[in-house]
Amino acid sequence: MKKNKRLMVMAGGTGGHVFPGLAVAKKLQQQGWEIRWLGTADRMEAELVPKHGIDIDFIKVKGLRGQGIKRLVLAPFQILNAIFQAKAHIKRWQPDAVLGMGGYVSGPGGIAAWLSGIPVVLHEQNAVAGLTNHWLAKIAKKVFQAFPGAFKDAPVVGNPVREDVVALPDPMQRMQDREGAVRILVMGGSQGARILNQTMPQVMAQLGSGFEIRHQAGKGSADEVRLAYQQVGVEHVEVSEFIDDVAAQYAWADLLVCRSGALTVSEVSAAGVGAIFIPFMHKDRQQALNADHLVACGAALMIEQPQLTVDKLAGEIQKLGRDTLLSMALHARAAAQNNADQVVADAIVALTEQK
């Protein structure tokens, strides 16, 4: 009896790494592949991945950026230990390929796979390559990038996006007959965004009536944000810590106000919704660069955090009538690259057939 092929996905830390990995995993599961995950026990993958019916192994590893002298001295030993842990998991399960989607776990996992003779496939979600993927690209059999600029010669394929987001009706079908309050969805990503939690209640108080708000505040912040809206007299607002059915929220919204993490940018485009991006302030402007192409094509506006004020954001929202919002949504949908999960899955299949 022919044995099913096996893929080990290495991804963790944030939804921006984990959800694209799940999208590729689902494509291969549909072709009969067995999937196993490599992650860390204290990050979101530990809880999220098993909910999708995928077994997960853990290694102990942490990032190096911004750490003190003691951590830097110990780092080589900790990395070696993580590589040995990953190698043990790989030896026990014997995957045919590994897929690195970023996060601290991908580094030791990718090196362990390479040392074990297992082909490594990488996908970089951001417009600026993370430190882990920058080094792993040198040993990977295949490298993909979501946006131009992360790597010089890697194919640009977009980000793997959940099928329920891709399957949403066209913006024209959703939005052309809408009337009444403009629907604003505020999203801070899987961790929430303090700047949005602090700013949006004041923005909506300044704008007054005519808007309906749904605000994803992040873990532990919902009560505080709900109170902030109440204190400035804003009604018609729903506040939650996390969004389970993100596709339904995109379908509901006329406008997003959000960070521009890689997955958010790709989902905004796939869904076809206009956005005002407030990029997180990386020193390499990673999130700003992620969103540049949607701003350039008229699908989005961007206010970088140093320039963000209540007056500025309120003014930008006030300018956006329904015709403009529909136009932005259509431009967003037109810019979407929605087959990244299939492209990456096909590359993994092709690599294993060469073995």
From Swiss-Prot:
Main location class: membrane
Name this polypeptide is given: UDP-N-acetylglucosamine--N-acetylmuramyl-(pentapeptide) pyrophosphoryl-undecaprenol N-acetylglucosamine transferase
Membrane in keyword set: yes
Organism: Vibrio vulnificus (strain YJ016)
Keyword field: Cell cycle, Cell division, Cell inner membrane, Cell membrane, Cell shape, Cell wall biogenesis/degradation, Glycosyltransferase, Membrane, Peptidoglycan synthesis, Transferase
Family matches, as InterPro entries: GlcNAc_MurG, Glyco_trans_28_C, GlycoTrans_28_N
Membrane protein topology class: Peripheral membrane protein
Function recorded in the entry: Cell wall formation. Catalyzes the transfer of a GlcNAc subunit on undecaprenyl-pyrophosphoryl-MurNAc-pentapeptide (lipid intermediate I) to form undecaprenyl-pyrophosphoryl-MurNAc-(pentapeptide)GlcNAc (lipid intermediate II).
Disulfide bridge partners, by residue number: none
Pathway(s) it belongs to: Cell wall biogenesis; peptidoglycan biosynthesis
Alphabetical GO biological process terms: carbohydrate metabolic process; cell division; cell wall organization; lipid glycosylation; peptidoglycan biosynthetic process; regulation of cell shape
Known EC number: 2.4.1.227
GO CC, any one term: plasma membrane
One Pfam family it belongs to: Glyco_tran_28_C
Catalysed reaction, written as an equation: di-trans,octa-cis-undecaprenyl diphospho-N-acetyl-alpha-D-muramoyl-L-alanyl-D-glutamyl-meso-2,6-diaminopimeloyl-D-alanyl-D-alanine + UDP-N-acetyl-alpha-D-glucosamine = di-trans,octa-cis-undecaprenyl diphospho-[N-acetyl-alpha-D-glucosaminyl-(1->4)]-N-acetyl-alpha-D-muramoyl-L-alanyl-D-glutamyl-meso-2,6-diaminopimeloyl-D-alanyl-D-alanine + UDP + H(+)
Similarity comment: family membership: Belongs to the glycosyltransferase 28 family. MurG subfamily.
PANTHER family per UniProt: GLYCOSYLTRANSFERASE, UDP-N-ACETYLGLUCOSAMINE--N-ACETYLMURAMYL-(PENTAPEPTIDE) PYROPHOSPHORYL-UNDECAPRENOL N-ACETYLGLUCOSAMINE TRANSFERASE 1
Entry's localization field: Cell inner membrane
GO molecular function, one term: UDP-N-acetyl-D-glucosamine:N-acetylmuramoyl-L-alanyl-D-glutamyl-meso-2,6-diaminopimelyl-D-alanyl-D-alanine-diphosphoundecaprenol 4-beta-N-acetylglucosaminlytransferase activity
NCBIfam families: murG
Binding-site residues for UDP-N-acetyl-alpha-D-glucosamine, renumbered to this chain: T14, G15, G16, N126, R162, S190, I243, A262, L263, T264, V265, S266, E267, Q287
